[in-house]
Amino acid sequence: LYVISKMMDIYDVDGFRFDLMGILDVETMNAIKEKGKKKKADFMLYGEGWDLPTMLDYKKKASIMNQNVMPEIAHFNDYFRDVVKGKTSDDQKYSKGYITGDTEHAFSFLSAITGNVMGDPLFKRFEQPDQTINNIETHDNSTSWDKMHACCNNEDRQTRKERQKMMILTTLISQGIPFLHAGCEFCGTKNDDSNSYNAPDKINQMDWERAVFYSDIIEYTKKCIALRKEYKQFRLHTTEEIMEHVKVNVSDGGIVFYDIFMEDEQHHIDAIRCIFNPSYNGREYDFEPNWKCIFDEYGQAHEEYGTHVEVPALSIRIFARIA
């Protein structure tokens, strides 16, 4: 606690991220949070809440299973990562997630994009959305691009690029705290090294040539970030708000509908609808009047209104209903 306090005083630190947070105890983490919040109201505390083999009693571990007694402390959400991208262990590198093409995960995907805070029939993992760090990759395990090199090895580069874009947008429009690993915006690779902590710079360095080659995804990522900032609907602060305003369901073929019904006077809309289509086939739907596309697979908005909408293959389209 002394070190935490001094670092905030001397270096004006805004928050801390704890590696292997699960080896610590609930009491210590809560004390750190209280100390930090007294100094800065927006102090942020998060870490790896894995259930690690220590002598601590299970109920005292600062693990994700005890999130209910650690309010305002966030955890890397491996459920989100595995459902969206697919499991990351070497023995399951060929398994797919929802966005990488396995629509059997569609129902689990509903839990992931709603912050894992909605109960039965969905999987509730957290008490509040500020406890989940939504990510598709971190410094550990394979990058999402390397993961697709295994699980989507039958697909061409352009198809995998579209899936990469879908994973980035999913991270940024889901309820909870988005986490983008540096390099995912230009399809970063570690040359299939899934445990590169002791690998040389050749593996772990940022390959800036890829930033040129995949500049279109960088631009798309910028638009995704701007979208989240622009629309408060993707940044609901409490479980109560999510329960009140968000509706999710799975349509035919594993297509996911993510609706947020909320009055928005700034944009003169009363609902947002996100449609996820990770399949090879485009979809068409008939809506009630006054819907328009505000974000397509290029990050562009469409001017026209209509009742008939299209969602191309391998894309997420976002629509708004004019109030």
Where are these regions (language model features)?
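Conserved alpha/beta catalytic core and glycan-binding cleft of carbohydrate-active enzymes
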Residues: 33-38, 42-187, 191, 246, ...
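Active-site neighborhood of glycoside hydrolase catalytic domains
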Residues: 1-56
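Carbohydrate-interacting/catalytic domains
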Residues: 158-161, 172-180, 184-186, 190-323
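Short, glycine/charged-enriched secondary-structure capping and boundary segments
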Residues: 30-33, 59-62, 195-197, 288-290
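Active-site-proximal structural scaffolding
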Residues: 9, 22-29, 128, 160, ...
